[in-house]
Amino acid sequence: MTYQQPDAKGFYGKFGGQFVPETLMTAVIELDKAYREAKEDSSFQAELDDLLKNYVGRETPLYHAKRLTDHIGGAQIYLKREDLNHTGAHKINNALGQVLLAKRMGKKKIIAETGAGQHGVATATAAALFDMDCTIYVGEEDVKRQALNVFRMELLGAKVFSVTDGSRVLKDAVNAALRAWVAGIEDTHYIMGSALGPAPFPEIVRDFQSVIGREAKRQYAEISGGKLPDAVMACIGGGSNAIGMFYPFVNDKSVAMYGAEASGLGLDTEKHAATFAKGRPGILHGALMDVLQDAHGQIMEAFSISAGLDYPGVGPEHCYFNEIGRATYDSITDEEALEGFKLLSRLEGIIPALESSHAIALAQKVAAKMSPDQSLIVCLSGRGDKDVMQVKERFEAEAEGK
C-alpha cells in the first residue's frame, strides 16, 4: 500500500494536527491554501529548482567514504554531502522554498527561530536575496554557543532577537517566534525550520527537504546499476534533514531507516534530548508529538552538546514512523558524537557539524553489524565550522582534567 500521510487534517496517524490558538488559525489556513496552490504551479517549482541549482549549488555529491568504511569494517558507507550547500547545511533547501512561498502570499516580513544558527543563517540569506525584512529569534544560551552564526545573520541584514525566557534555548525561541507571528499576522510569514509545528508546516518542510533523499536515491541507483541502498540514516532533533532523507524511501520496504537522537550526558541522567527513548505523546508548538515531559505534563529541558538537537520534541511524521516501526531511532551521547566528529575529520578530511556527528556515531554501530556487500547512506546535514571553537574548548578542558 502506498504511503499517504498526512491526512486532510494534518495528522500522521494520531500525531500532528493543528493545536493553535484561534488567533493563529487564520494564518495557518492561509498558509495551507497558498501551499496547495504553489504545489500545483509548475512555475513555482521551476523557480525553486533554478535557485537550488544555481544559488545553493545542488545537487550535492553522494560520496563513498572508503576510509571510514574500511575503519568500521562493515557496510559501504556513503555520505550525502548537505554540508556542501551554500550556507553550510541542509537548512537552505527549506528556507528558500518558504521565502518563495511568502513572496507568493504577498508577505513583506520574515521571522524564524534557530538553535544551531544554521536555519537562522539560511533564512537571513533567503530574505536578503529577496529583499525582505527578517527577524531571527535565538535563545540566549544559543547566542553564546553560536556567536559566529549570530554575526553571520546580522551581516546578512537580519535582526537577531535574544530570547531570555525559560531555558533560553530552541524551544523558547520557537515560543517567541510564534508570539511574534500572532502579532504580525497580516504582513509576516513564519519560517519554521524543522518538520514541526501545526499543519501544514511538517509537510511543507518535508517536501522542501525531500530533495535530499530524491537525489541520494537517484545517485545511488546510478553507481549501483539501479539498486536501492540497504539503509539510510540521519541525525534527528526536530527531524528535517532526517525526513528529507527518509521520505523518498518510505515505500521501499527493503530500505531500513535510522535516526540518531541526542542522549547528551546519558539516558540515566536528565541531561539529554532523547525524545523517543524517554518521551511520551504531548502537545508542543501546535502539534501532538512525542515530547520530553515530567509527571505533571510540564515540558522538560532538553540537553545536547549540539545546539541543533536540544529540542524536547520530535516531528509528528517521525513519531508516526516510530509507532508503526518503519524507522528505528537510537540515542547517541555527547561523547559518542565527539568521537564521530574526530573520526570523520581524521579519516575523510571532512569536519562535520556536531548534529551530523551523531549520525556518524550511529553509522559506526549500524554499519559494523552489516556486511561489506551492503550499503548505508548517511545524511551529512552540515559542516562543522560553527562548532570548531566549542569543540576546541571542550578538548582543551578535558586535556587539563577539568
Curated annotation (Swiss-Prot):
UniProt keyword Transcription regulation, yes or no: no
Enzyme class: lyase
Pathway assignment: Amino-acid biosynthesis; L-tryptophan biosynthesis; L-tryptophan from chorismate: step 5/5
Modified residues (N6-(pyridoxal phosphate)lysine): K91
EC number: 4.2.1.20
InterPro entries, per the entry: Trp_synth_b_CS (IPR006653), Trp_synth_beta (IPR006654), Trp_synth_beta/beta-like (IPR023026), TrpB-like_PALP (IPR001926), TrpB-like_PALP_sf (IPR036052)
UniProt catalytic activity: (1S,2R)-1-C-(indol-3-yl)glycerol 3-phosphate + L-serine = D-glyceraldehyde 3-phosphate + L-tryptophan + H2O
Cofactor: pyridoxal 5'-phosphate
GO cellular component assignments: cytoplasm
This protein's record includes keyword Magnesium: no
UniProt GO molecular function: tryptophan synthase activity
Keywords: Amino-acid biosynthesis, Aromatic amino acid biosynthesis, Lyase, Pyridoxal phosphate, Tryptophan biosynthesis
Record family assignment: Belongs to the TrpB family.
Quaternary data: Tetramer of two alpha and two beta chains.
Purpose of the protein: The beta subunit is responsible for the synthesis of L-tryptophan from indole and L-serine.
Protein's name according to its UniProt entry: Tryptophan synthase beta chain
Naturally occurring in which organism (per UniProt): Streptococcus thermophilus (strain ATCC BAA-250 / LMG 18311)
Upper lineage: Bacteria, Bacillati, Bacillota, Bacilli, Lactobacillales
